[in-house]
Every structure is written in C-alpha cells, then in structure tokens.
Amino acid sequence: MSSPWSTVISMHFQSFWLCLGLLFISVNAEFMDDDVEMEDFDENSEEIDVNEGELPSEINYKTPQPMGEVYFTETFDSGRLAGWVLSKAKKDDTDAEISIYDGRWEIEELKENRVPGDRGLVLKSRAKHHAIAAVLAKPFIFADKPLIVQYEVNFQDGIDCGGAYIKLLADTDGLNLENFYDKTSYTIMFGPDKCGEDYKLHFIFRHKHPKTGVFEEKHAKPPDVDLKKFFTDRKTHLYTLVMNPDDTFEVLIDQVVVNQGSLLEDVVPPINPPKEIEDPSDKKPDEWDERAKIPDPSAVKPEDWDESEPAQIEDLSVVKPDGWLDDEPKFIPDPNAEKPDDWNEDMDGEWEAPRISNPACRIGCGEWSPPMIDNPKYKGVWRPPMIDNPNYQGIWSPRKIPNPDYFEDDHPFLLTSFRALGLELWSMTSNIYFDNFIICSEKETADRWAADGWGVKILVANANEPGIFKQLMAAAEERPWLWLIYFVTAGLPIALIASFCWPRKVKKKYEDSEYKKTDICKPQTKGALEQEVKEKKAALEKPVDLEEEKKQSDGETVEKEEEAEPEEKSEEEIEIIEGQEEGNKSNKSGSEDEMKEADESTGSGDGPVKSVRKRRVRKE
C-alpha cells in the first residue's frame, strides 16, 4: 500500500511536468507562424535543406544558372549593371527639388551573413526617388502558361517607410526605360511595402475594361499571416508570385504559401461589374414619406397638464444654519503673505496677496439659499404619443437599370503582356538589398534557382545564428511579456524541489497524549499507581466509537492502537503494585496526610519506590 507522501509527491511531479509542457508550448508558439501552411512541393522539385548543423566547412558558391525556359534572370554577381537603365524622368505635381529620380544604386555583398562571390543590387539613398529597369529577354504573353516571378529582398537596416516591390512594365509602343516613372503603364506590381506599422505584401494587376478600354487596378486580398518579422529580422527573404492559366494565384515567402485565391473572387474591386446599377437620373418624389412613426393627430393635451412648473424647486423644509455669516467672504487675502523683494510693480503690476479660505466660515459664509429638489408637480412640455405612419413608404432608393458598361470576363488571367522589369521606389531607409530575379513559367525552374541562390544564403545565416540563450533574449526584447514566461518556467521547478526537500511542518493535535518510547520512567507511590490502574480499567471498559476514530488524524489513530493493548500490561502493573505493597509493610504507621503528600509527589516517599512506565489515556 503506497504511503500518502508518495501519492502527494507523484501528484506534484505530474502537475510540474504538465505546467512545464504548457509553458514550453506557449513559448515555442511565438516563434512559429500558426497560420502559414507549408507548400507541398512536387516530387521532382528540389527541396531546400536549411537545417542548422549541415553547413559544409566551406561554401563553394556558384552563380545560379537557369534550367529551362526563362524570360528574365539577374544575379548581379558580375558587379556590373549591364542591361539596366537608370531613369532620368521627373515626377509630376512635385517640387523640383524632390521630383528627380536621383537615388543611388550600388552592387554590393550583404552586410551580414555574406556569401563570398554573391552580390546584389542595393538601394543606397534615403528620402530620394529611385527608378531603374531592365528589358526582358522576350515579352511574356498571357496565354496557356503560368507566370512565375521570384526575387530576394533584405532590409539590412530595417525599414521605417519604403517599399521593395517590382513592376512588370506593359509592352507598349511608347515604353522608354529612361522615362520610367510612377505613372508608367505596368501590368503587375508585386512585393513588400511598409510605412508606419502598416506591413503589406502587394499583388496588384491592371485589368482592361473590354468595352471602355480603361485600365483599373485590382488588389488581391491581404495575406493571413503577420508580415512584421520579414521587415525587421534583417534576413534575406524570397518572394514568389505564381499566376496560373486557370485564374488562380499563389503568393509565397521563403517557399511558404502566405496567400492564395482566385482572380475572379479574391480581388478588390471585383473583375466583373454588377449587371444593374442605380439610375443616376432618378430622383425622390416630393410626396415620398419616409417617416416610420408620426405624432398621433387625435391626441389631446390633458386639461390638468401644467407646463409652467419648473423641474426643480427650493427645499422649504431646510432652514439656514445658526452661525451662518451672510456678510463674510468665503476667501480672504493671506495675512501672512509678503510681497517678494524682486516684485516690480511696473513690470509685474500691483501685488496682491494670495487668497485663502476664510477661517470664520466654519459653518458657512455668503448669501444663503436653500438647496434645490425635484419638483413633484413637474410634467414638462406635452407632446402627443407616436404612432405608426399609415402613409409610410419606406426608405427611397433610385431604381435599378441595366449597367451599360457591364461585361463578363471569365478569364482574367489574360492580362496585357509585359516586356520589362522595373523598381520605382521611395524609401526613408537605405541599404535595401535585391538579388536573384527570375521570371519563368515552370515552378521547378524557380525552385532550383532558389536553391542555388537563396538556399545558400539561408545555410550561411543559420550557421551564424546565435545560440538559444541569445535567441530567447532577443525574443524577450521584442515581446517583453516573455520575461514572465521565462521567470515562471525557471522558478517553478525550483519551488517544487524546495517544497519536496523542505516540506512544511504540520502541528500534531493531542501531542501530549501520544505514546513515546523515549518517555523517562518515573518512580510512583502506591496511591498514585492505584489511581492510575483504576483510570486504565475505566478506559478499557469504555466502548470505542469506530466512526469517530476514523475521523482523527493518522498520528491519533496510531496512538489509539497503542492505547488499546489488552489486559496483559494492566496485569503486569498490578503485579508491580503488589510488590510495592510488600515493600511498604514497614511503613504502615505513616499518617494519611503523609500518604496524600506521597501520592501528589513524583519522586518522594518513605518506602522504597519501584520505577514504572507511565501511560496516559486521553479522555474523550
């Protein structure tokens, strides 16, 4: 049978491991994106293994080479901007000082976690307009092949306000990259953008109205994940856009789907306009009654309705208190105040002492007036009750007419073709890093390109990742409430161990009645022994209530078992008493008073005394 202590300890350990497990799960949940679903890659696609600890001793970086058909690639590893054109345009409706696209671009390695031989395009200027573009190897025509656009971004200094998105410039006759500016016609705009605490991942495409020929921007729904860490962790992230001929799209960050949907259903405003619209020439008739309730015209004000009674009146039952001083002011100048020595009446005006409460106004000062109370006769202005309007016609709205510009586009994937890629950006933060652009139609080609470029960067970054302690500290700096989790996680096992090693002492009830084997044998006289034997016999003859004994503490139960030892001990004590009587025959002449004194004493007596074990029986 297990002891109570072992049961308690077992329960403590179960509670400890349960709490520790819950805390561990809550902490780890902060480092995971709960809403992100990992993409199921094709079996033939190459997976990017970025597990820590698998980094080879030396990184032999090689410039990625495209496999398969591509429309555009750029790695910047050559160190030259061959094929790229800097804009010389000016923004419209802007001051001349800031209208010029004079932002500086450089080709550099990463500031942190650099890979030898790998370079990227870096935006170097703050608070300036930047514009640079390059022509594709061949225009992309939306037909029966998917569109895949992929590139890398690293906000090396974080980001306050600025973007890192790209524009796919429409294939128009007047396209001139030297005149590339914010109003240049584009087909798709894609990439991260941030200002203040608004973190965005744009996917915007321009859809042409088939009847009017007017282009309208369509914005994809925002991602369901928190984008903040992609702007703040200063790591290189891979952004991918996939548009399929079946009018679906996917947006990925670091090969993980963060947004997906239909071009027909998941964009704002919708692709297809409504079939009917409100008639702009329709007007509400003058007699149209929109009142749901009206005053009852048949209601009459009661004759006894008095509108002249005020809402409150003076309480006439209150009288002015004795000692009220009508002529005394409530505040008086402070008699102890003195004009400052540096007070200049020409500059500061006439000096006046500060005012204090009048000490004479203990009961009250000034003009006395009785307090105001609610007037029981007050009824206010009479108004007729409201009833349903029999002429109510409802809220008027213009009639619907067929939409003259209605159309139905069942295949919005067929957008305007594009033939150039451009970056047209304004940023308040410099050192934004771009690398490894690719435009293709096969996901396997884009995945292999990512493995050869971005995958190597991730291997290096993971190898340089700080230890778990530094990661926990960094996480706590970003989320201060994690300090409480750390404290509880570290303090809980210490508290449990302390409670096991130094348990709280429980005071025993009836400690005086507990049998102790270490009790010292005390000599007793005949009278004391006789009295004790009588008490023991009376206790043994008394019935024991088992139900009450079960309610006592464990220590008390053990005590009762010892007290319930049968008559064997009582007979031994009787024999001791008889021996005591034989030894005391020579002292029969002792007086009764002396015997009482001997009975009350614990160690004195005329006759020889034999030591016996003293037992006490608790009296109920």
Curated annotation (Swiss-Prot):
Biased composition (Basic residues): 611-620
GO BP terms in the entry: ERAD pathway; protein folding
Region span, Disordered: 267-311, 526-620
Comp. bias intervals (Acidic residues): 559-581
TM stretches of this protein: 481-501
Membrane topology note: Single-pass type I membrane protein
Main location, first listed in the record: endoplasmic reticulum
Phosphoserine PTM positions: 570, 586, 589, 591, 601, 604, 611
Endoplasmic reticulum recorded as keyword: yes
Chain ranges on the Cytoplasmic side, renumbered to this chain: 502-620
One annotated GO molecular function: calcium ion binding
Comp. bias (Basic and acidic residues): 275-294, 529-558, 582-593
UniProt Sequence repeat ranges: 277-290, 294-307, 313-326, 332-345, 349-362, 366-379, 380-393, 394-407
Compartments (UniProt record): Endoplasmic reticulum membrane
Superkingdom per UniProt: Eukaryota
Keyword Ribosomal protein belongs to the record: no
Complex and partners: Interacts with PDILT. Interacts with ADAM2. Interacts with PPIB.
Function: Functions during spermatogenesis as a chaperone for a range of client proteins that are important for sperm adhesion onto the egg zona pellucida and for subsequent penetration of the zona pellucida. Required for normal sperm migration from the uterus into the oviduct. Required for normal male fertility. Binds calcium ions.
Family: Belongs to the calreticulin family.
Name of the protein in its database record: Calmegin
Organism encoding this protein: Canis lupus familiaris (Dog)
Phylogenetic classification of the source organism: Eukaryota, Metazoa, Chordata, Craniata, Vertebrata
Gene that encodes the chain: CLGN
